[in-house]
């Protein structure tokens, strides 16, 4: 069995973290405007780089496994794309055109776009324009009615799930002409212009949505809410029939994050200080199986 290792990286809360492709390095934000990159050594985790560019608390980090680029977002309403050149991380400022702080950021599966959630009731979807040599942000606004707390990309590089403090999880199209190829039809729909709402699902008792995740196939969506609920949605391929939804009311404090580890298993964690494993399917429902 794998032995748990505990490492103290900071004496302050970590507001964001992201591992590189082989998990040999981790970027963290110690509740400040700084990004610290630690490398794994036989002696433990050693500080390798300190990245400065933001002027308020960094709220989101993601490390692209193939291009090795880091994207960061902050309460300062901006994002940076960090590229390793020799032994130096070089930042590129991305103007998100937000009037409130960013909350989360994620690279798309093909790493040619990233999405930034915010307190401005906006998701900024950013893509690179070769002609102008800069990152351009397009906004998803409606029907978001509050802070967007979490986002997750569909494997097809086009659909984007968002959890919001307006008690809903939604699936949007983030299709950008000239960047994306037309995705094949899926259970979420066929014609998907930018900003299309492909699904909208409430928490059972009006709880903020804290975390969203697509399954590996992208055919299921899970989200956790502040009403101590976990919901798994299987959309219907037919527009005439309703999606299958499995709602688990938890006898515990709320979860704040969720991720699938296979089509039939997911892990959720939150204020109970222990990750929990759930297993199930569309046909048989879902249940808690064990604690990690």
Regions found by a protein language model. Give the residues of each.
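Intrinsically disordered, low-complexity acidic/Ser/Thr/Pro-rich linker and tail segments
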Residues: 1-36, 183-197, 292
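Short C-terminal beta-strands that terminate individual repeats in beta-propeller domains
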Residues: 4-9, 47-53, 73, 91-97, ...
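Canonical WD40 repeat/beta-propeller blade segments in eukaryotic WD-repeat proteins
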Residues: 11-19, 56-63, 99-107, 145-153, ...
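Structural hallmark of WD40 beta-propellers
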Residues: 23-27, 67-71, 80-81, 91, ...
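Conserved strand-to-loop turn within each blade of WD40 beta-propeller repeats
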Residues: 29-32, 73-76, 117-120, 163-166, ...
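WD40-repeat beta-propellers
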Residues: 35-40, 79-84, 123-128, 169-174, ...
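Solenoidal tandem-repeat scaffolds enriched in leucines and small polar residues
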Residues: 95-185, 194, 211
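Terminal intrinsically disordered, low-complexity extensions flanking WD-repeat/beta-propeller proteins
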Residues: 147, 177-200, 243-292
């Amino acid at each position: 069995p794998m032995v748990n290792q505990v490492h103290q990286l900071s004496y302050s809360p970590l507001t964001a973290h992201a591992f590189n492709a082989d998990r040999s390095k981790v970027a963290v934000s110690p509740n400040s405007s700084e990004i610290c990159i630690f490398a794994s050594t036989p002696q433990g985790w050693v500080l390798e780089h300190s990245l400065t560019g933001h002027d308020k608390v960094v709220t989101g980090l993601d490390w692209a496994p193939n291009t090795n680029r880091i994207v960061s977002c902050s309460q300062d309403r901006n994002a940076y794309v960090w590229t390793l050149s020799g032994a130096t991380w070089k930042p590129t400022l991305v103007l998100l055109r937000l009037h409130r702080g960013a909350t989360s950021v994620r690279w798309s599966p093909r790493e040619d776009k990233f999405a930034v959630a915010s307190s401005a009731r906006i998701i900024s979807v950013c893509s690179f324009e070769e002609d102008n040599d800069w990152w351009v942000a397009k906004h998803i606004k409606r029907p978001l009615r509050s802070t967007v707390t979490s986002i997750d990309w569909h494997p097809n590089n086009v659909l984007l799930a968002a959890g919001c403090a307006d008690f809903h999880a939604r699936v949007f199209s983030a299709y950008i002409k000239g960047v994306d190829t037309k995705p094949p039809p899926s259970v979420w729909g066929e014609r998907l212009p930018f900003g299309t709402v492909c699904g909208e699902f409430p928490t059972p008792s009006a709880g903020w949505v804290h975390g969203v995740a697509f399954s590996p196939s992208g055919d299921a969506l899970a989200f956790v809410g502040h009403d101590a609920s976990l919901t798994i949605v299987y959309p219907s391929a037919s527009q005439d029939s309703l999606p299958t939804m499995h709602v688990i009311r938890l006898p515990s404090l709320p979860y704040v994050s969720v991720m699938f580890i296979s089509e039939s298993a997911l892990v959720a964690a939150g204020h109970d200080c222990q990750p929990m494993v759930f297993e199930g399917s569309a046909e048989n429902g879902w249940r808690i199986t064990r604690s990690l």
